[in-house]
């Protein structure tokens, strides 16, 4: 694994992305309420490849009523692509999983400092009534459907009143007034750690302190969406991701600590008695979340750097920045669980399907060829049960199938699955993250074994050496740019004989007549056309 060199705050990360040509700066006036997110969304709806996506820095942000903001807005700066995400950890893309596994095993405790850049400017009291949240360039994520501007790239910090352990989660927060937010923390099984804290404060008949961080070191922000175990301090895991302690500072008006190098921190108290209607809002499951009663947060302070950058993420329909944030970390953590917690042999890769299905619903588990069937089924069951919200459909494939290619998955199911014996359903799983309209709270799991269970003839494409030569020839001829799609060459799958290799080699040398002489000598009568040669000649021998 490469040595970690994670940026210490969001602006250092932005500078590094800029140096690598991964930032598009937009100086034209952009309306945060109608234009900003739709423009960034085209990166995901416009057919761009991962490596073509960029972070967008909007430096001339205006509002629907003519407001002008002196704070730039960064969208796509966390995870428009895996490359941008990896830059936030200071490692190559291939090391993302290793960094996460190491951080979970070797967390680094934060250090408390007396003051930090996040408190260079402090707004409290009447200042909040006059401007407060309205002074921030908070975009509307889904214009035409969202009920308000929403904070999306959040770290909502809360603390367990019993043991004092903090939790950081990424939860949406709607602007309600200059000094009030509507906060949604998932109450479902495997939902928000902050919600569990809220339940405890409710029993104590106390308001819940909350600090919402908007922009800080990417490694810290990455912990928010990852659904770490309850009572795991995300700040320590973030230190593991950075390879150094996170500098923290005490909040001004609530008893919480936040990253000292944050861009903006919104402090407040969440009501545990009365809930307020919140939504609609375009959610990461790909549908609009309708109006629900959710938490109401009274803002007690807004602290920030003198020149902060406001951070927002593209969520809603996948692929999105939100799904990349989860995918690049979920997949290695699932693989680590299957291999080293459950001890499953033969598992080589876990891929969570991203387009439209939002990662959580469909999981592909890849196995080495020849893995015992018992291990294949243990692996699928393990993937389906690690998180309550993940694994409605789990499909196992062999290692010649690209699990990122849905067409290859269908091909594997069509030719390698017997739906009498290779399919299993399990009832009573949580419906998880999704639209509520017409859905039951419970649903089932479907598992399909689409691995190679016996030998098969080779894949009917030219052998690799000929396809490689043809690829070079294609480029020499200056034909339209091509991107190889797996499978792009033929390969053996166990059902092949040496004499057929000899025939094929003779054919490409132009010696096909010799093969014809061979087969002429092997003619046979009293047979039906399409009778396999092997069976007849084996009996003859």
Q: Where does each model-flagged region fall?
A:
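Extended, highly charged
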Residues: 1-541
């Amino acid at each position: 694994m490469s040595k970690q060199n994670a940026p210490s705050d969001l602006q250092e990360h932005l500078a590094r992305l800029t140096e690598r040509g991964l930032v598009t700066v937009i100086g034209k006036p952009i309306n945060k309420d109608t234009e900003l997110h739709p423009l960034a969304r085209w990166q995901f709806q416009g057919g761009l490849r991962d490596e073509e996506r960029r972070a967008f820095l909007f430096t001339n942000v205006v509002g629907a009523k003519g407001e002008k903001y002196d704070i730039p807005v960064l969208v796509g700066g966390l995870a428009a692509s895996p490359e941008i995400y990896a830059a936030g950890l200071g490692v190559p893309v291939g090391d993302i999983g290793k960094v996460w596994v190491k951080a979970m095993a070797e967390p680094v405790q934060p250090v408390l400092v007396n003051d930090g850049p996040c408190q260079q400017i402090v707004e409290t009291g009447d200042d909040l009534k006059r401007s407060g949240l309205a002074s921030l360039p908070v975009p509307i994520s889904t214009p035409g459907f969202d009920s308000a501007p929403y904070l999306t790239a959040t770290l909502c910090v809360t603390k367990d009143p019993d043991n004092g352990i903090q939790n950081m989660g990424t939860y949406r927060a709607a602007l309600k007034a200059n000094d009030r937010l509507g906060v949604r923390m998932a109450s479902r099984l495997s939902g928000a750690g902050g919600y569990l804290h809220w339940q405890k404060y409710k029993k104590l008949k106390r308001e819940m302190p909350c600090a919402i961080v908007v922009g800080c070191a990417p490694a810290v922000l990455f912990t928010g969406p990852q659904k770490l175990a309850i009572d795991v301090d995300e700040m320590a895991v973030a230190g593991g991701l950075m390879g150094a302690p996170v500098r923290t500072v005490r909040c001004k008006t609530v008893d919480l600590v936040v990253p000292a190098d944050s861009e903006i921190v919104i402090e407040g108290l969440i009501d545990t008695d009365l809930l307020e209607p919140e939504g609609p809002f375009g959610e990461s499951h790909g549908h609009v979340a309708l109006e629900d009663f959710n938490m109401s947060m009274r803002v007690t302070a807004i602290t920030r750097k003198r020149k902060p950058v406001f951070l927002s993420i593209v969520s809603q329909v996948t692929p999105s920045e939100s799904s990349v944030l989860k995918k690049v970390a979920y997949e290695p953590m699932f693989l680590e669980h299957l291999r080293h917690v459950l001890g499953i042999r033969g598992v080589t890769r876990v891929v969570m399907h991203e387009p439209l299905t939002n990662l959580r619903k469909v999981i592909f588990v890849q196995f080495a060829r020849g893995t015992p069937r018992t291990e294949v089924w243990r692996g699928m069951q393990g993937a389906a049960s690690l998180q309550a919200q993940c694994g409605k459909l789990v499909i196992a494939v062999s290692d010649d199938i690209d699990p990122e290619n849905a067409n290859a998955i269908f091909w594997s199911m069509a030719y390698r699955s017997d739906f009498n014996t290779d399919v299993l359903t399990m009832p009573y799983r949580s419906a998880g993250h999704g639209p509520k309209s017409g859905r039951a709270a419970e649903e089932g799991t479907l598992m399909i074994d689409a691995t190679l269970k016996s030998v098969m003839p080779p894949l009917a494409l030219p052998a690799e050496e000929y396809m490689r030569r043809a690829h070079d020839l294609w480029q020499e001829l200056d034909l339209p740019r091509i991107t190889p799609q797996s499978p792009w060459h033929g390969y053996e799958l166990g059902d092949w004989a040496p004499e057929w290799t000899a025939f094929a080699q003779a054919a490409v040398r132009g010696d096909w007549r010799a093969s014809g002489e061979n087969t002429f000598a092997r003619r046979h009568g009293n047979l039906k056309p399409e009778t396999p040669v092997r069976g007849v000649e084996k009996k003859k021998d």
